[in-house]
């Protein structure tokens, strides 16, 4: 990719696509994005996914945010994400915990905190 495309994440955050690779063998697009969010927190996964959907004309259920790395106080995040051609391929390759994380659902772990074993 010759010129670096810009992606608007929110009013306070803008990203630059550093790497955009088409992986035809797997059926996905692999993107590295550097997001500048000076004076505000790290953008949420939902905000990132919304921006990527608009920028690449994709569907929400085909985008997976793999990793968000932010250095303390820097206001810059490095984001790795994948855009798949089909939901079937995505579900075969990506770990379930990442799909749950991007969907905003949390997996319930067994056990209880302060429930039956607590003294009263």
Curated annotation (Swiss-Prot):
<keyword id="KW-0689">Ribosomal protein</keyword>
<dbReference type="GO" id="GO:1990904">
    <property type="term" value="C:ribonucleoprotein complex"/>
</dbReference>
<dbReference type="InterPro" id="IPR012678">
    <property type="entry name" value="Ribosomal_uL23/eL15/eS24_sf"/>
</dbReference>
<comment type="similarity">
    <text>Belongs to the eukaryotic ribosomal protein eS24 family.</text>
</comment>
<dbReference type="GO" id="GO:0005840">
    <property type="term" value="C:ribosome"/>
</dbReference>
<dbReference type="InterPro" id="IPR018098">
    <property type="entry name" value="Ribosomal_eS24_CS"/>
</dbReference>
<feature type="region of interest" description="Disordered">
    <location>
        <begin position="101"/>
        <end position="120"/>
    </location>
</feature>
<keyword id="KW-0687">Ribonucleoprotein</keyword>
<dbReference type="InterPro" id="IPR001976">
    <property type="entry name" value="Ribosomal_eS24"/>
</dbReference>
<dbReference type="InterPro" id="IPR053709">
    <property type="entry name" value="eRP_eS24_sf"/>
</dbReference>
<protein>
    <recommendedName>
        <fullName>Small ribosomal subunit protein eS24</fullName>
    </recommendedName>
</protein>
<dbReference type="GO" id="GO:0006412">
    <property type="term" value="P:translation"/>
</dbReference>
<dbReference type="Pfam" id="PF01282">
    <property type="entry name" value="Ribosomal_S24e"/>
</dbReference>
<dbReference type="GO" id="GO:0003735">
    <property type="term" value="F:structural constituent of ribosome"/>
</dbReference>
